[in-house]
């Protein structure tokens, strides 16, 4: 299971990252069980689920990213829910509520005056939705140039990066989607433009971002900070993708850890608020280049604005006063 929130301690700015940084360090620690027809694979910090149809997804506890620069971290367990409160030096609090199964339920920012902004409300369920977290939508009707729909960060200007982070959905959004529906439904994510960054050179089997590669995230960070300054309720998904070399489980774990590493670096080195980021790995499931061999194009980190998906397309409106919940 992901490490419980009770084990979290603050990390001072500038402190070196601890723990393993390569898959080889804990591959032998994986444990596989069967539960209700599903295969559950646990490894340090991650749970991988394979459903009866062979589809796999990965889940991790994102509260670990919030330790950086925290003044204090408090944990409360009420009714099976774990409530982690990260207190920053300026008195701002980031509150993360996790369900008994490790599912993120809510993420809230509380300012020094006690006013709250709900950033993620994953407890929402559409009354007409059927089944679990997977939503199957028809392909969106894309009316913008393809290179504005999937932007290559290496060729894009800072203005295009920022414009993409502010861009509306490419097609009509019929309803609000829960956070998990966004994470696990590619057809939902396809409603939003994205930015691909495939120039970070990770070592094989590692998710550590070398110092000489970190600067490649600067233009992304500047766009994120501009967008969050404009609307403090923005949420951006940092996606990790691999090529097809290696096992499915290794690729899923590696991509998830690389996405989390990129999100962490955006906060630690460039000051992007951790609460406005989420990370998720998809392994080799969504290649840009159809090949079973090594592919630099497929080994990439993708940044995608998901705010309109979470609130039903109202993200372009000015944020309501602090303490007002997003529309249902």
Walk through the language-model features, giving the residues of each.
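Periplasmic OmpA-like peptidoglycan-binding domain that tethers envelope proteins to the cell wall
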Residues: 212-214, 234, 241-328
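Short, low-complexity, polar/charged sequence segments that are solvent-exposed and flexible
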Residues: 67-68, 103-105, 114-116, 126-127, ...
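Envelope-exposed proteins and targeting segments
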Residues: 45, 80-82, 91-93, 114, ...
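A mature extracytoplasmic/lumenal domain signature
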Residues: 53, 62, 88-90, 99-101, ...
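Periplasmic peptidoglycan-binding/tethering modules of Gram-negative envelope proteins
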Residues: 118-120, 125-235, 308-328
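Extended interaction-bearing regions that mediate binding to partners or small molecules
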Residues: 1-173, 178
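Sterically constrained small-residue positions within well-ordered secondary structures
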Residues: 40, 75-77, 86, 188, ...
């Amino acid at each position: 299971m992901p490490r419980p929130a009770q084990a979290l301690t603050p990390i001072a700015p500038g402190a070196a990252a601890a723990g393993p940084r390569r898959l080889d360090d804990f591959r032998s620690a994986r444990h596989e069980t069967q539960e209700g027809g599903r295969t559950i694979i646990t490894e340090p910090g991650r749970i991988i689920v394979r459903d009866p149809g062979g589809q796999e997804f990965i889940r991790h506890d994102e509260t670990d990213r919030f330790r950086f620069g925290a003044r204090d971290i408090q944990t409360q367990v009420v009714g099976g829910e774990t409530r982690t409160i990260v207190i920053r030096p300026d008195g701002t609090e980031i509150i993360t509520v996790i369900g008994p199964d490790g599912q993120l339920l809510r993420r809230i920012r509380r300012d020094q005056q006690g006013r709250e902004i709900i950033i993620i409300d994953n407890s929402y369920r559409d009354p007409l939705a059927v089944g679990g977290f997977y939503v199957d939508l028809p392909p969106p009707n894309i009316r913008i140039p393809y290179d504005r729909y999937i932007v290559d960060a290496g060729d894009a200007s800072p203005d295009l990066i920022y414009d993409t982070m502010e861009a509306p959905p490419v097609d009509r959004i019929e309803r609000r989607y829960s956070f998990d529906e966004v994470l696990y439904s590619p057809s939902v994510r396809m409603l939003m433009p994205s930015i691909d960054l495939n120039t970070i050179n990770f070592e094989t089997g590692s998710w550590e971002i070398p110092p000489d590669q970190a600067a490649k995230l600067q233009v992304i960070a500047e766009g994120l900070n501009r967008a969050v300054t404009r609307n403090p309720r923005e949420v951006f998904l940092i996606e990790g993708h691999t090529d097809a070399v290696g096992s499915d489980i290794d690729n899923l774990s590696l991509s998830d850890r690389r996405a989390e590493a990129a999100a962490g670096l955006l906060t630690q080195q460039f000051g992007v608020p951790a609460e406005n980021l989420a990370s998720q790995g998809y392994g080799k499931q969504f290649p840009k280049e159809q090949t079973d061999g090594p592919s630099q194009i497929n080994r990439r980190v993708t940044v995608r604005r998901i705010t309109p998906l979470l609130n039903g397309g109202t993200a372009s409106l000015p944020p309501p006063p602090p303490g007002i919940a997003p529309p249902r």
